[in-house]
């Protein structure tokens, strides 16, 4: 018994998941690579909750796989798949529906459809790539990726050095494109699961992103200041979450507040575009109008799908 809710950032996935869970007595499983981190609530749009009997609870709904990882720890697709498997098993064992909600498409695909096994990190190769980036600039690595794997390069921002290096690493270690390894043999998870995609007009979503960013900046600033005071740095995996580097730049005087806000808005819009591209691969989703979400209607569609 599973429902999947997908869509771009700032699209309303969390609210819909909570409303559905309340209607059917279900529990939510977050599919978000950033909300796993403790302390970062505002900047990751993590729903505010409290722990009850060891489980994060939001307005009476158990909300799993959020707020448990230290900022110095890394989390990946394999970690999520293992954690999600255990979580869903325990939810279903209670006779409840697991509502998977989030925008980290790779996590979603890995759990529901499986993915090719990717090679482990090669530290020597990474050191070589890092040296190239230091001497020739980040753009040089992105250019290398564009030549080796244009599909991955189109999805990865040139400034995201970690992801650019990982895609190049995969290509150099396997001789295959990361984009091919991540798509060949991909099951269309919307064919065998009830999958809701929250759809938005591009301009409407862009406006929502801008408004949300402006509203969360003060909270992100306080969170970031608190984490820096605890000894974390911009290189801590958790603080590499979208937007926090710009807040740190503001704290350090490298950006004005308007500059930091503008940059976060741009990065978030780019992220939303990549999410739309990812989820477009699924051909049998129920598309729900983000401006008029109706949990009861979606449950009716779910009931019809199960027949």
From Swiss-Prot:
Q: What class of enzyme is it?
A: transferase
EC number per UniProt = 2.5.1.75
Residues recorded as binding substrate, renumbered to this chain, are: 9-14
Fetch the SUPFAM superfamilies from UniProt: P-loop containing nucleoside triphosphate hydrolases (SSF52540)
Positions of the UniProt region annotated as Interaction with substrate tRNA: 32-35
Keywords, comma-separated and alphabetical: ATP-binding, Magnesium, Nucleotide-binding, Transferase, tRNA processing
Q: Which reaction does it catalyse?
A: adenosine(37) in tRNA + dimethylallyl diphosphate = N(6)-dimethylallyladenosine(37) in tRNA + diphosphate
Q: Does the keyword Nucleotide-binding apply?
A: yes
Query: Record's family?
Result: Belongs to the IPP transferase family.
What name is this protein filed under? tRNA dimethylallyltransferase
Organism equals Elusimicrobium minutum (strain Pei191)
Taxonomy, top ranks, is: Bacteria, Pseudomonadati, Elusimicrobiota, Elusimicrobia, Elusimicrobiales
